[in-house]
Design a protein with these regions (language model features):
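Active-site helical microenvironments for divalent-metal-assisted chemistry
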Residues: 1-134
Length: 134
């Protein structure tokens, strides 16, 4: 409910409802682990200002979920590769980030490809390669 309500008016780069990205990230984990599924659904919520870590605590999410969502929240003041390294110690964050990177790298989701899209794909590829070796 947190993610679906928070992202109800947000669309992705192709104009589709943003919540579908979160659902695909969850589905692509191929798991029945409800906490891992929650992490996947919530992975962009704090970063995109849908909610705060404190609210997740108040709503009763487990420490496992809160820690992983916190690690998956990219503070823009932190360089991207440092952010990736910082989350790499947490199994749940790595699993969800790999699924997120796979979904974000799917160029069929984009309306058209620009130079910035190719640059972003290169950044994602470097992160995916690093995390997949963990």
């Amino acid at each position: 409910a947190v993610a679906s309500e928070g992202f109800k008016n947000k669309t992705d780069k192709s104009g589709k409802p943003y919540i579908l990205h979160c659902i695909r990230v969850m589905q692509n984990l191929h798991t029945q682990d409800e906490e891992l599924m929650s992490i996947a659904i919530l992975h962009d919520c704090v970063e995109d200002k849908v909610c705060t870590i404190q609210e997740l605590v108040a709503w009763g999410f487990s420490q496992r979920v809160i820690i992983a969502v916190g690690l998956l929240t990219h503070d823009q003041a932190v360089p991207y590769q440092e952010y990736i390294k910082n989350l790499s110690w947490n199994y749940d964050a790595v699993k969800v980030k790999l699924s997120d990177l796979r979904d974000n790298s799917n160029i069929t989701r984009l309306k058209g490809l620009t130079k910035s899209d190719f640059d972003r794909m290169e950044k994602y590829h470097i992160a995916y390669t690093y995390l997949s070796k963990i």
